[in-house]
Regions:
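Short hydrophobic "strand-cap" motifs at the C-terminus of beta-strands
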Residues: 142
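Residue-level detector of alpha-helix initiation sites
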Residues: 66, 145-146
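Conserved active-site-proximal phosphate/metal-binding subdomains
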Residues: 3-11, 18-19, 116-138, 146-272
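Active-site entrance/lid segments in N-terminal catalytic domains of soluble metabolic enzymes
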Residues: 1-133
Length: 272
């Protein structure tokens, strides 16, 4: 099992961090799901795609690399556009060469896994590079986009539209906890950080005692993906539940993926 490959030092580090914040350690650190094989094993991913295409989806999107050729072909067979995220000009060119229909150029302001190039620079760079190579696939702008004015600005730079994420995280319908939504409202744009402490790859998330600990001098260092998630997800889940129960120290650990646009969030509302 993958959990058996987690060094004891990392398990102890997480246990101590939880205890410091009044949270009972996660025990065996195992996720609720079966961890006998790496997440998103190719056969499993293809089965998920087959199920997805049985439904009336409007678009399917790939992140972290070039979509497999089978995914692109399935999109064509079902008349569903295939999009993919790019954090650099070179990424966009590889995606276009692979036959992707839509490219989401995601700047470093974005929440979750992201690169280092800002949206303001990335959009015109990607648009220019694609046109120079003869590709006419539309580009959607992503990363820090929270308002209509920002969308219009991105379209003025050549984007065909915008791809938004963080703007929805403070809504009542989102998957986030009430504790995290409240922290979003209180946060400034400088209160996010690109950290490996959650997934093992750099991902932008809200600064918290969790991210501080993994970037601190006593950190054992993040494990490679997907190992880090095996210890981070159960721990953060337990901390969130404890915070929801009134544990103020546990609240300090609560975090989630969110972009720098969080500074523009001033209330919790409905997506309707």
């Amino acid at each position: 099992m993958l959990i058996d490959r987690i060094p004891q030092g990392h398990k102890d580090f997480v246990d101590e961090l939880l205890k410091e914040h009044g949270v009972e350690p996660a025990g065996d650190h195992a996720r609720a799901r079966n961890d006998e094989a790496p997440p998103f094993w190719p056969e499993e991913a293809m089965e998920q795609l087959r199920i997805a295409f049985q439904h009336p989806i409007k678009m399917i999107i790939n992140a972290l690399g070039v979509p497999p050729a089978e995914m692109i072909q399935m999109g064509r067979d079902h008349g569903v556009p295939v999009a993919a995220l790019a954090g650099a000009k070179e990424h966009a060119l590889r995606l276009a060469a692979a036959g992707v229909d839509i490219i989401v150029a995601q700047g470093g302001e974005a929440g979750g896994h992201c690169g280092e190039v800002s949206t303001l620079v990335l959009i015109p760079e990607v648009v220019r590079a694609l046109r120079a190579e003869g590709y006419d696939c539309p580009v959607l702008a992503a990363g820090g986009i929270m308002t209509g004015g920002q969308m219009a600005a991105c379209m003025a730079m050549g984007a065909a539209g915008a791809w938004t994420g963080s703007v929805w995280l403070a809504t009542l319908e989102s998957e986030t906890s009430q504790i995290f939504r409240e922290k979003m409202v209180d946060a400034r744009s400088r209160d996010t950080v690109r950290s490996k402490g959650r997934t093992g790859k750099y991902s932008r998330q809200l600064k918290s005692a969790w991210t501080d600990a993994w970037e601190g001098p006593d950190s054992p260092g993040a494990l490679p993906m997907p190992m880090q998630s095996l210890i981070s997800e159960p721990a953060i889940h337990r901390a969130t539940k404890a915070a929801e129960g009134g544990n103020e120290k546990a609240r300090e650990l609560v975090t989630y993926f969110v972009g720098q646009g969080v500074g523009l969030v001033d209330n919790i509302t409905s997506a309707r």
